[in-house]
């Protein structure tokens, strides 16, 4: 048995599920009566999602549609960080949503402090965009997972637990 057990806290999403959710939203926009003739464009790139349409009302409807499709595919809507609505040429509007992947350093520090405050014998270590938590006791690690799940609403990113060893 290893001397120390560890697990990683990560913030990630299944890209293929996001692609499927966006494709479903595109199909629904093309067939839905109120959105059919709005020339709505939904562009998914590696790090962002761009929605361009005719009015703010249509933009809000498309954004809600994408979020609903993402939720149905077990993706957290916290992966979308929507920017401001911008006016573009032709009276159209655009909104860019950054796709959040990885734990930002400030969130990792807050998580590490939360863990250290409740479990002094547990060692959280920030490793890039992953927070590795180690302890000699597996029971303490399971208690840390419960603690982080209870406080997950305080963080603006979705958290998953991987590599439990």
From Swiss-Prot:
Keyword Metal-binding part of the UniProt annotation: no
A GO term for molecular function: nucleotide binding
GO cellular component: cytosol
Alphabetized InterPro entries for the sequence: DUF520, UPF0234-like_C, UPF0234_N, YajQ-like_sf
Keyword vocabulary terms for this entry: Nucleotide-binding
Disulfide bridges in this chain: none
Similarity section: Belongs to the YajQ family.
Protein task: Nucleotide-binding protein.
Protein name as annotated: Nucleotide-binding protein RoseRS_0530
Species assigned in the record: Roseiflexus sp. (strain RS-1)
């Amino acid at each position: 048995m290893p001397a120390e057990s560890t697990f990683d806290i990560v913030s990630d999403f299944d890209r293929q599920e996001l692609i499927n959710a966006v494709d479903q939203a595109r199909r629904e926009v093309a067939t839905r009566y109120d959105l059919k003739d709005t020339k709505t464009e939904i562009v998914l790139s590696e790090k962002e999602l761009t929605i361009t349409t005719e009015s703010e009302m249509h933009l809000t409807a498309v954004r809600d549609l994408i979020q609903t499709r993402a939720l149905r595919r077990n993706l957290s809507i916290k992966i979308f960080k929507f920017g401001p609505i911008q006016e573009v040429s032709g009276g159209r509007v655009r909104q860019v949503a950054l796709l959040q992947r990885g734990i930002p350093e400030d969130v990792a520090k807050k998580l590490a402090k939360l863990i250290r405050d409740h479990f002094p014998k547990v060692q959280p270590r920030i490793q890039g965009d992953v927070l590795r938590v180690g302890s000699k006791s597996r029971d303490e690690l399971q208690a840390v997972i419960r603690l982080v799940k209870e406080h997950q609403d305080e963080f603006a990113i979705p958290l998953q637990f991987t590599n439990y060893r």
